[in-house]
From Swiss-Prot:
Entry's Gene Ontology BP terms: cell division; cell wall organization; peptidoglycan biosynthetic process; regulation of cell shape; UDP-N-acetylgalactosamine biosynthetic process
Family, similarity comment: Belongs to the EPSP synthase family. MurA subfamily.
Keywords of the record: Cell cycle, Cell division, Cell shape, Cell wall biogenesis/degradation, Cytoplasm, Peptidoglycan synthesis, Pyruvate, Transferase
Taxonomy, superkingdom: Bacteria
One example GO MF annotation: UDP-N-acetylglucosamine 1-carboxyvinyltransferase activity
GO cellular component, one term: cytoplasm
Protein name: UDP-N-acetylglucosamine 1-carboxyvinyltransferase 2
Catalytic EC class: transferase
Residues that span the membrane, as ranges: none
UniProt function note: Cell wall formation. Adds enolpyruvyl to UDP-N-acetylglucosamine.
Protein's cellular compartments: Cytoplasm
Active site location: 117 (proton donor)
Binding site for UDP-N-acetyl-alpha-D-glucosamine: 93, 122-126, 305, 327
Length: 423
């Protein structure tokens, strides 16, 4: 890609940042609309490439999608179970939600194995285990997953690994199955509650979303509805870290503070002043940051998606901080890039030791995945001089209007249009 972000670092940021709808909800809510038989209206969707890719896929299936600003009106009435072995499905990891939704509605689907961020092995074996338990035959042929069922019947499904994707996918497939489904060792993320709320508004019978046991009683038909997406807790957390790194008073609006308890606790431990309101968080200016140890866990633990952005902030902390990722042990690709800027790190197994404080210097760096990109933006804002970040497409997959938002609070950040490439 010839696209790059250019950041002139060292500026103090002040003002208000608005958080958009949750990316990890949006990519499941849009496929979930396939299960309805009339119009579904989704409000508050983020303006990111994954969302537009999903609109294109729904239109390929024969659905109609009208969208304006952050609202989409999806009419799934004329959809057919068209095979999707290649094409748009390969562009995003979350295209696997089409498996559960199409299986639930049509009893069959062909979905090319998805792309998105590369974070080491991310098998979908738990998804497949769930589909098979519901009565589907699943085969992998030439890089595409083929699913077919004469009928779907409720089942008791125990997830061997707590997986957000598998929990949601099994919910999508089970809401129109015959009888009762119980998902045990289910993931508890807020995005799962969001998807369950949409499905319930469509007429599904779901109990226990947000706990480790979800009970679903299948229904024959689901109807359209109105649904407003929850705010993106990872975008909110990223903005909190960014405000602590380079801010002199930044207010972050459209947040649900209970979704952010992990990052709030750690930033408090680091000595960062915060004012927590009902739907906003104010992050004050901080001179000295205390070192802190972090371990990522499934929700409600500290989120793996905020591990990388926080690593950039820890270059400012006094002493050695240890960051351990128990979810994705190989999620440290950003470290080599921040080292180019003068960061001091030591990798030990699934942990990174961050030594500080160091003054980062602008450099040419590359984002290898979405949250690594966020970490490099924070590092670039902290650094003296000019930072060029390549791999912009990764950042734009998950952060909508990032340049406009950061420019509005005083960041000097531009997108190079060297050879404009359509993303």
């Amino acid at each position: 890609m010839t696209n790059k972000l250019i950041i002139q670092g060292g500026k103090k940021l002040a003002g208000t940042l608005q958080v958009d709808g949750a990316k990890n909800s949006a990519v499941a809510l849009i496929p979930a609309a396939i299960l309805a038989e009339s119009e579904v209206v989704l409000e508050g969707l983020p303006d990111i490439s994954d969302v537009y890719t999903l609109y294109d896929i729904l239109e390929e299936l024969g659905g109609s999608v009208r969208y304006d600003n952050k609202t989409a009106v999806i009419d799934p009435a004329d959809m057919i179970s068209m095979p999707l072995p290649t094409g748009n499905v390969k562009k995003l990891r979350a295209s696997y939600y089409l498996m559960g939704a199409m299986l639930g509605r049509f009893k069959k689907a062909v979905i090319g194995l998805p792309g998105g961020c590369y974070l080491g092995p991310r098998p979908i074996d738990q998804h497949i285990k769930g589909f098979e338990a519901l009565g589907a035959k699943v085969t992998n042929e030439q890089g595409a997953i083929y699913l077919r069922a004469d009928e779907l019947k409720g089942a008791r499904i125990y997830l061997d690994v707590v997986s957000v994707g598998a929990t949601i996918n099994i919910m999508l497939a089970a809401v129109r199955a015959k009888g009762k489904t119980i998902i045990e060792n289910a993931a508890k993320e807020p995005e799962i509650i969001d998807v369950a709320t949409l499905l319930s508004n469509m007429g599904a019978i779901i109990k226990g979303a947000g706990t480790d046991t979800i009970r679903i009683t299948g229904v024959e038909h689901l109807h359209g509805c109105h649904h407003t997406i929850i705010p993106d807790r990872i975008e909110a957390g990223t903005f909190m870290v960014l405000a602590a790194a380079s801010g002199k008073g930044v207010r972050i609006e459209n947040v649900i503070p209970t979704h952010l308890e992990g990052i709030i606790a750690k930033m408090t431990e680091m000595g960062i002043p915060m004012d927590i309101e009902e739907d906003a968080i104010f992050v004050g200016e901080v001179e000295k940051i205390k070192k802190v140890d972090i371990k990522t866990y499934a929700y409600p633990g500290f989120p793996t998606d905020l591990q990388q952005p926080l690593t950039a902030l820890l270059t400012r902390a006094e002493g050695s901080s240890v960051v351990t990722d128990t979810i994705y042990p190989s999620r440290f690709k950003h470290i080599a890039e921040i080292e180019r800027m003068g960061g001091k790190f030591k990798l030990e197994g699934r942990s990174a030791v961050v030594s500080g404080p160091v003054k980062l210097q602008g450099s040419k760096v590359t984002a290898t995945d979405l949250r690594a990109g966020a970490a490099l933006v924070i590092a670039g804002l902290l650094a003296e001089g000019t930072t060029e970040i390549h791999g912009v497409e990764h950042i734009e997959r998950g952060y909508s209007k990032i340049i406009e938002k950061l420019s509005a609070i005083g960041a000097d950040i531009t997108r190079s249009t060297a050879a404009e490439t359509k993303l």
